[in-house]
Structure formats: C-alpha cells, structure tokens
C-alpha cells in the first residue's frame, strides 16, 4: 500500500541561539521572564512549566462565563480571582466587563503580605499607558484589557478585584477574567515582583515591547522538503529547526471506500523531539 508523507522543514539556524536554557540555579525574575517574551523561539520549548488558567467560566457547563470567582474577599465588595501558591509566576491577565467605564480596581498580594504590593484600576494596570504596563505588552483592545507583564512570586500571589455596582435591573455585573499561572518546581529561586520595578526589569520589558512592536519573526534558514514513500519509515532531522507542514497522501485507489475511515483511525502519527524516547505527539491520521 502506497502512502506518501511530505514534511517541509524550515531550519532557523541563526536565531536559535536564543533557545538555550537558563543557567541552573538562576532566579526567575521579571527580567528573566521578559527575555522570553522577547524571543519567539521560546514558544517551541517543551521543557517549560505548564500553564494553568483561572477564569470566570460557568461551572454549571452553561454559557454564562462571567461573575464566577474563587471566593469572597475579606473586604466587602471585593472578590478573590486567584490564590496561587509559589514558587511560580503569572504570565497573563485578561479582563472585560467594565462596559460603562466603571474603574474596577485590582489588588495583588505577594508572598502572604497583608497589604497589596501592587494595586490600581483596570485602566491604570492594563490600559497600556502607564509604565511598566505599556502597549503592546499591556493594552485595551476590543473592549478587553490584558497584560503580559510577568508577575513572579516566591511564596504566593492572591489577586482580588472590585466586584462593582450591580446593573440597573439589580443583577450582578458581568465580569469576565482569565489569569494564566505557571507553577515552578519546589525550591526554584524566585525574585518576587517588586514595586516600583528595578531598572533591570524595566529595561528587559522595554526590550520585549520593542520586539513585539516590530512584529518581526526570526529569519528563516534553509528550507527543504522530504518525501517518504514507505509509511513505516521514520523521518529524522537535526536541529534546531521548525516543521511548517505535514502532508499525508494515502493511496486511496487501493483502499475500499467502506474501509477508509477505519484506516485513518488506525494510522498513527508519532513525533518525538530532541532524542526523547516518549512521543510528544501521537494521534490518528484521521
């Protein structure tokens, strides 16, 4: 049975130097995390911590994905959006719901502090006009506020938001939020977010802003296409590089029409990166 697998590989030789791991024992900080924002090749790294998202989604399975919080704050009129355990960092905050201009205020309590280290209303923190929360790392766009300014913490981070006044009909305000958290391995040294930011952190964020504003991807290296006539063969490539396209062409003329769906389910695509003995990708062709 004939099957052709086509793989288009575009190597990114020059720019890949930025993909090296950080020295062992180096502390995670705003500056080190901002360096990753300035290097799009970090997106392809598999050795990075998982990301967990805390959101206002409808816990009943419905479509009312607003107004759901972790719990009430000890301060009346405030809600706890997330109570995170360290070490770790928040990589993204997204918020919407202030349709009438209500200045929802946020509080960020780091490492068990009783006084918020960082606080401000949604426009100040995520509107893209106040340092270091400047566009395009933080911005108001399409009725939403967001920030990619990293917020590292050694012991923990509690994020609270002002609930706001009720709507005219007495129903709770429709507040939507997303908070992306990455937990770090226990014992990882972390420089907790400081306010005001040290100059080193400000400079790193400015570099990331410049890269994002330029909207320039790493220069492509040599492109080559590999065709495999035998489905049992494995294609191997030396890195660094990027796979841009996978194309599969079964010899349909030799497969009865009633068997084609089953064949697509039986054929498995397996991809392993960087010498791993485990599949990073394993899925049926169809």
Task: Set out the residue ranges of the language-model regions.
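N-terminal secretory signal peptides that target proteins for export/translocation
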Residues: 1-3
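Bacterial N-terminal signal peptides
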Residues: 6-16
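Beta-strand-centric surfaces of beta-sandwich/beta-rich domains
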Residues: 23-286
